[in-house]
Amino acid sequence: MNLNSIPAFDDNYIWVLNDEAGRCLIVDPGDAEPVLNAISANNWQPEAIFLTHHHHDHVGGVKELVEKFPQIVVYGPQETQDKGTTQVVKDGETAFVLGHEFSVIATPGHTLGHICYFSKPYLFCGDTLFSGGCGRLFEGTPSQMYQSLKKLSALPDDTLVCCAHEYTLSNMKFALSILPHDLSINDYYRKVKELRAKNQITLPVILKNERQINVFLRTEDIDLINVINEETLLQQPEERFAWLRSKKDRF
């Protein structure tokens, strides 16, 4: 299996998995044009589309792709039923694509119906988990997003986190504002800054590393707790997550 990233819009990535036979799976195609160009250039045969949630920058290209390749099966959560989904999937179910089983994980927060797809080592997490950050809470609650991130953080260490946006540099600037002396955060920030200066992608990331540099996955970390306690005493990790998310929204 080969993992490919297709840039779209200002900062989206459309992920494509292809096998040796050229069959491919497309994740969150917000725009059809760059996907069609990649299909043509690589001689791929699209077999399926995975949708993580209903936002236009993740579903906008579905109609055109299905018109061009009517054999495509479009998997998605209930909230994408009117966006071209032909196979609604929910938490605990599996999608069998390209000879692999993908587990469906409900991750409400960014939207209420958001889902992720996991087949070791690939995690397609849409706008739930970003490198160094997490999605904004457009529909869900901080508690829901905290629980969603906890689920994803529990996946195997070698999981490849395939996020849908290039937000890593701004996320790491925020992380530094919270934990300015953290060695892992400082090292990763320098690495990301160099990559982005060359206009290079920072994704996918390995989950084991992500747990060290993503403050939203470190709500039980004593260093972070001490920083938060300087401003306010919060007993529960969900409350500390909400504090972080509120800070990030204003950053």
Swiss-Prot record:
<dbReference type="InterPro" id="IPR017782">
    <property type="entry name" value="Hydroxyacylglutathione_Hdrlase"/>
</dbReference>
<dbReference type="GO" id="GO:0046872">
    <property type="term" value="F:metal ion binding"/>
</dbReference>
<feature type="binding site">
    <location>
        <position position="55"/>
    </location>
    <ligand>
        <name>Zn(2+) 1</name>
    </ligand>
</feature>
<feature type="binding site">
    <location>
        <position position="110"/>
    </location>
    <ligand>
        <name>Zn(2+) 1</name>
    </ligand>
</feature>
<keyword id="KW-0479">Metal-binding</keyword>
<feature type="binding site">
    <location>
        <position position="53"/>
    </location>
    <ligand>
        <name>Zn(2+) 1</name>
    </ligand>
</feature>
<comment type="pathway">
    <text>Secondary metabolite metabolism; methylglyoxal degradation; (R)-lactate from methylglyoxal: step 2/2.</text>
</comment>
<comment type="function">
    <text>Thiolesterase that catalyzes the hydrolysis of S-D-lactoyl-glutathione to form glutathione and D-lactic acid.</text>
</comment>
<feature type="binding site">
    <location>
        <position position="57"/>
    </location>
    <ligand>
        <name>Zn(2+) 2</name>
    </ligand>
</feature>
<feature type="binding site">
    <location>
        <position position="58"/>
    </location>
    <ligand>
        <name>Zn(2+) 2</name>
    </ligand>
</feature>
<dbReference type="InterPro" id="IPR035680">
    <property type="entry name" value="Clx_II_MBL"/>
</dbReference>
<dbReference type="InterPro" id="IPR001279">
    <property type="entry name" value="Metallo-B-lactamas"/>
</dbReference>
<dbReference type="GO" id="GO:0004416">
    <property type="term" value="F:hydroxyacylglutathione hydrolase activity"/>
</dbReference>
<dbReference type="InterPro" id="IPR050110">
    <property type="entry name" value="Glyoxalase_II_hydrolase"/>
</dbReference>
<dbReference type="Pfam" id="PF16123">
    <property type="entry name" value="HAGH_C"/>
</dbReference>
<comment type="similarity">
    <text>Belongs to the metallo-beta-lactamase superfamily. Glyoxalase II family.</text>
</comment>
<dbReference type="GO" id="GO:0019243">
    <property type="term" value="P:methylglyoxal catabolic process to D-lactate via S-lactoyl-glutathione"/>
</dbReference>
<feature type="binding site">
    <location>
        <position position="127"/>
    </location>
    <ligand>
        <name>Zn(2+) 2</name>
    </ligand>
</feature>
<keyword id="KW-0862">Zinc</keyword>
<dbReference type="Pfam" id="PF00753">
    <property type="entry name" value="Lactamase_B"/>
</dbReference>
<keyword id="KW-0378">Hydrolase</keyword>
<feature type="binding site">
    <location>
        <position position="165"/>
    </location>
    <ligand>
        <name>Zn(2+) 2</name>
    </ligand>
</feature>
<protein>
    <recommendedName>
        <fullName>Hydroxyacylglutathione hydrolase</fullName>
        <ecNumber>3.1.2.6</ecNumber>
    </recommendedName>
</protein>
<dbReference type="InterPro" id="IPR036866">
    <property type="entry name" value="RibonucZ/Hydroxyglut_hydro"/>
</dbReference>
<feature type="binding site">
    <location>
        <position position="127"/>
    </location>
    <ligand>
        <name>Zn(2+) 1</name>
    </ligand>
</feature>
<dbReference type="InterPro" id="IPR032282">
    <property type="entry name" value="HAGH_C"/>
</dbReference>
<comment type="subunit">
    <text>Monomer.</text>
</comment>
